[in-house]
Amino acid sequence: MFKRTHYDIVICGAGPAGSMAALALKKSGLHVALTDAATFPRDKICGDSVSSVNKRILREVNPELETDLLDFSAKSNITQARLFSPEFRALQVSFKKTGHCIRRIDFDNWLFQHARQSGCDVYENARLKEIEPNDKGYTLTYTNGNKINASVVIGCDGAHSVVAKKLAGFKVDKHHYSGAVRQYYKNVAGNDGNTLEVYFLKDYLPGYFWIFPLSDNTANVGFGMLSQTIADNKIDLKKSIHRIIHNIPQVAERFKDATPLEQPIGFGLPLGSKKYRISGNRFMLCGDAASLIDPFSGEGIETAMESGKFAAEQAVNCFAANRFDAEFMYGYDERVYKKMWPNFRNHYLLQRILGNRTRLINTLIRVGNIPWVNKQIPKLFY
């Protein structure tokens, strides 16, 4: 199966984090393998929001990537967001830079195909089963029995990361984890195609319901809550989203002529509200595998791509210095958290303060319509 028995770097997972790492290693001169359990194109349950920051990250790696994304046809252009309080008062905020909504099956495949052309060896349908240390790095064993050796492993294998569990001992912490469901709909009324919509609903806090517009008059509709709240209250997210869409008049009116394109599908979000050790001897974790999802917005594509880029650059430094020990590798952790922790910390504080405080959320939505306050709100999204 594998072209080589040993690689300088094996990237486990070819989503935004892994593909970006591969792209950033294009000119490194290192032997790189990019592996994924799936065969592309494949779906990834998500809100499908691609912020303007993602374009900056693409530009830093290769300006042609940003240009190619702008020419991508299957996207909506996002210029604003509309937030609804529990009393259904609306707050509209405009973004200085245009973001996009793109189905993950399309966006991830687009990025993956660029990574495939970066010069790395790509292996699809390669599901990691075990990872064990050896005298030159790690031996990775896949479910089909094939093995590969790596000097450095970059774990980009998502919320249920094998690399994170085996090498960093990660376990789910429900206080820093969210559950959500997504359901695609056609013909949802009332959205002009360029607005992210978020509802804070009285009986469904702490959490929010969203309607994000895609191309072709399709919408990504979803609902998410903290996992600890879900467990404590025995909440069924699939039943909850059904009740929201059909039983809340202000929402149901928008869905009376809409058609569901699938059943609700659940997914987990490891939040960046808690710091972890995301590297060690000869390995790094990126994106969802490193719990780098924004604790308030649930945005994870941007941080996945940036952490993938950072990991690639750290790996190059490791080979240049011939140092792969945990102390040297910790430079990756420091860079990631220097960039991301201020937002994570502030957004986690906001998440905790708002909680299920209906009156407070109502008040903040009202205050948000004050012009100088309104200008600060886009930072929660893009």
Task: Tell me what each language-model feature is.
Residues 60-110:
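A conserved beta-strand/loop capping segment in the N-terminal third of enzymes
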Residues 130, 147, 229-311, 318:
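FAD/FMN-dependent oxidoreductases across multiple families
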Residues 9-11, 32, 283:
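Conserved hydrophobic helix-helix packing surfaces used for dimerization/oligomerization
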Residues 313-382:
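C-terminal helical "tail/cap" subdomain of flavin- and related membrane-associated enzymes
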Residues 26-46:
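Glycine-rich FAD pyrophosphate-binding loop
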Residues 2-17:
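Beta1/beta-strand and adjacent pyrophosphate-binding region of the FAD-binding site
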Residues 114-251:
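Predominantly flavin-linked oxidoreductase catalytic cores and closely associated redox partners
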Residues 17, 40, 160:
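Conserved Rossmann-like nucleotide-cofactor binding loop
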